[in-house]
Amino acid sequence: MGQTFIVFTPTNDMRALHPAEVVFFRYCAERKQWEVILSTQLPVVLRRGMTAEQIIKYSPCFVQIHQSYIINIDYLMIIKDNKCMLYPPFDNVTELFVSRKYKKELQDRFCL
């Protein structure tokens, strides 16, 4: 299942999250902040300064697929045309493309 971990919001509030609650993380270049999309489909903005390297250390199920995206592989259904398709009700998410830089790591990790 994975250990609960703590993230900080921009207002310095601490938010406890369980890996199963996290569908994916998205980097907002405009704000220069990561946000986490939860299984409730609500986004939680993370404090500035958080890096992808820090995020993927929270759980082995968090995998970076693009400079701006980290997914929870437990929600991954299929990769089609370099696009991650998630299990319902997240099958309408269309933004999760796997970049060339991260594709090899993803394939190696899952023996694809």
Language model features with spans:
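Basic, polyanion-interacting recognition surfaces, primarily
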Residues: G2-L112
